[in-house]
């Protein structure tokens, strides 16, 4: 039998148990609430806080999901600013590309088809370049200046172009091959990186002054002399001559012997003659200048083409990727002819490159202005279909663009610009140029219509301004690529042109076509704005105008 105290003691023990249980429940509830705040509410607040970071993305939800992934992996925090998030995103992007390289290399080694092997070789080269470009972009963004922001936008635009080029090369092959390269993911990340960069503002530390079309006084005496001198008087580091009077007999040998990642200008002088070879200036060959005895005297010639098994990318007689490349007083040609379809004479993917007083001859796809910032001056470019194409930020000044007689039933297209995203800082600008017919086309103009361009990609962007347009230009001015593809998203413009082909009354009525009357609308396509020429062309010594004549 229980004593009188026992019920009281039992009741007290139960009360203590209840109190303990309530405390435990409260603590558990508190931890659950904290968990929800940290892992559910915080990311939501983070997403709201950084929604502006994705405001220009084509797929804003995908962009935000990438940002959320960075937070969930504790790579960034809710306090991280936009630039810090972008840099972490790019570091992760480099890892993804490095992971893709051995996969693509293994695919290439397992393939016996020469065309597929060639396409994968191109992809490997482009992936390797892209890793460097993204790494350079991270360093540029970290400096947080307007000029470095522009550099990063150019380089990241090039990365997206590289991925799309790889996709284009593989497009005719199996879907499994494309999936194996992880290209779709890499392209998505490149677009998101550009969108993030576009949303971040930086202080404007550049003051771009209008140029006067002459060499600036601040150019070093050596660089000015290089641009003004003839080849034989230039004081070259290496000389190429077919007759053995130079150190090298081929340009390819001289380029291979040039120093890697040079900090100063390295000059190769190529004596007059016809050199049958294909030459590549790799990304390691920086600040390289190749100069000849004149566009009619020193000729580099090749005939690689798509019909005979080459890729468009690797059909180039001369390809240049190394930053700061200069080509002067030389003819580059591809003699494959119109029946061989795509056959590139010159491909340029070198940032801050200059082509001065050169002749570039071929038929279809003559000049592949592939990517990065480029400037062409006093040069002569001939071709038929899409004879200036690619996705560089490129300005032509005082050049002659000459349409040739194409193959039967073909039409001439001066340009085919390949911008794939509105955040890419790319486009083709033709200023102070003459667009004319060759002597063999002139008698048969009615048989072979010539257009200023057609949209190769969705956001194609080309402006022709302050130029002479010959009577070869069809009154419509511009041609379709495939039905209504890109007609609403492209940007084609004409400003202050003259000549029999310059009338705009019968031009296309597409939403993306602009007959520009306000100089302010034309300014983004000048040397100063499109390629930021005021900050780098001055150091090359080439003559240029960085604004509009008016």
UniProtKB/Swiss-Prot annotation:
Pathway membership: Glycan metabolism; pectin degradation; 2-dehydro-3-deoxy-D-gluconate from pectin: step 1/5
InterPro entries the UniProt entry points to: Invertase/methylesterase_inhib (IPR035513), Pectin_lyas_fold (IPR012334), Pectin_lyase_fold/virulence (IPR011050), Pectinesterase_Asp_AS (IPR033131), Pectinesterase_cat (IPR000070), Pectinesterase_inhib_dom (IPR006501), Pectinesterase_Tyr_AS (IPR018040)
Subcellular location: Secreted, Cell wall
A Pfam short name: PMEI
GO cellular component: extracellular region
CDD domains on file: PMEI-like_4
Positions annotated to bind substrate: 312, 342, 454, 456
Disulfide bond entries: 331-358, 399-433
Site residues by UniProt (Transition state stabilizer): 364
Residues of the active site: 365 (proton donor), 386 (nucleophile)
An example Gene Ontology biological process: fruit ripening
Keyword list, A-Z: Aspartyl esterase, Cell wall, Cell wall biogenesis/degradation, Disulfide bond, Fruit ripening, Glycoprotein, Hydrolase, Secreted, Signal, Zymogen
GO molecular function terms listed in the Swiss-Prot or TrEMBL record: pectinesterase activity; pectinesterase inhibitor activity
PROSITE patterns: PECTINESTERASE_1, PECTINESTERASE_2
Source domain of life: Eukaryota
PANTHER family: PECTINESTERASE
Miscellaneous field: The PMEI region may act as an autoinhibitory domain and prevent untimely PME activity during transport.
Function: Pectinesterase may play a role in cell wall metabolism during fruit growth and development prior to ripening and may be required for preparing cell walls for softening by polygalacturonase during fruit ripening.
Name under which the protein is recorded: Pectinesterase 2.2
């Amino acid at each position: 039998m229980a004593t009188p105290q026992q019920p009281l003691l039992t009741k007290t023990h139960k009360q203590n148990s209840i109190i303990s249980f309530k405390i435990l429940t409260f603590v558990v509830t508190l931890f659950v609430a904290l968990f929800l705040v940290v892992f559910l509410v915080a990311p939501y607040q983070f997403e709201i806080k950084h929604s502006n970071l994705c405001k220009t993305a084509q797929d804003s939800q995908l962009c935000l999901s990438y940002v959320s992934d960075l937070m969930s992996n504790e790579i960034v925090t809710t306090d991280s600013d936009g630039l810090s998030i972008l840099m972490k995103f790019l570091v992760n992007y480099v890892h993804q590309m490095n992971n893709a390289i051995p996969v693509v290399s293994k695919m290439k080694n397992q393939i016996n088809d020469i065309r597929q092997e060639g396409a994968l070789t191109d992809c490997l080269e482009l992936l390797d370049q892209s890793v460097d470009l993204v790494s350079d972009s991270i360093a540029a963004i970290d400096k947080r200046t307007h000029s470095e922001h522009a550099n990063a936008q150019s380089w990241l635009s090039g990365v997206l172009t590289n991925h799309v080029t790889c996709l284009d090369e593989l497009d005719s092959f199996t879907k499994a091959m494309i999936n194996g390269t992880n290209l779709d993911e890499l392209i998505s990340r490149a677009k998101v990186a550009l969108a993030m960069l576009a949303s971040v503002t930086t202080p404007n530390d550049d003051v771009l002054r209008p140029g006067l079309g002459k060499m600036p006084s601040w150019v070093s005496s050596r660089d000015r002399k290089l641009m003004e001198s003839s080849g034989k008087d230039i004081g070259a580091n290496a000389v190429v001559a077919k007759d053995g009077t130079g150190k090298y007999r081929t340009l390819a040998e001289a380029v291979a012997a040039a120093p890697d990642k040079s900090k100063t200008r390295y000059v190769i002088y190529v004596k007059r003659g016809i050199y049958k070879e294909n030459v590549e200036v790799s990304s390691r060959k920086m600040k390289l200048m190749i100069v000849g005895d004149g566009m009619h005297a020193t000729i580099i010639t090749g005939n690689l083409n798509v019909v005979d098994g080459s890729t468009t990318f690797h059909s180039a007689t001369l390809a240049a990727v190394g930053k700061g490349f200069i080509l002067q007083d030389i003819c580059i040609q591809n003699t494959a002819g119109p029946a061989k379809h795509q056959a590139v004479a010159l491909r340029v993917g070198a940032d801050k490159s200059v082509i001065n007083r050169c002749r570039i001859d071929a038929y279809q796809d003559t000049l592949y202005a592939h990517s990065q910032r480029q400037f062409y001056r006093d040069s002569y470019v001939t071709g038929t279909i899409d004879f200036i194409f690619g996705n560089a930020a490129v300005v032509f000044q005082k050049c002659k663009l000459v349409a040739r007689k194409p193959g039967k039933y073909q039409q001439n297209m001066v340009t085919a610009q390949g911008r794939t995203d509105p955040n890419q800082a790319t486009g083709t600008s033709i200023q102070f140029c003459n667009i004319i017919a060759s002597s063999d086309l002139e008698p048969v103009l009615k048989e072979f219509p010539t257009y200023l361009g057609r949209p190769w990609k969705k956001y194609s962007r080309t402006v022709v301004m302050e130029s002479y347009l010959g009577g070869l230009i069809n009154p419509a001015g511009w041609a379709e690529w495939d039905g209504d593809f890109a007609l609403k998203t492209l940007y084609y413009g004409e400003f202050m042109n003259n000549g029999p082909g310059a009338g705009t009354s019968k031009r296309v009525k597409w939403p993306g076509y602009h007959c520009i009357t306000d100089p302010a609308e034309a300014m983004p396509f000048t040397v100063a704005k499109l390629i930021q020429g005021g900050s780098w062309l001055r150091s090359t010594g080439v003559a240029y105008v960085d604004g509009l004549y008016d």
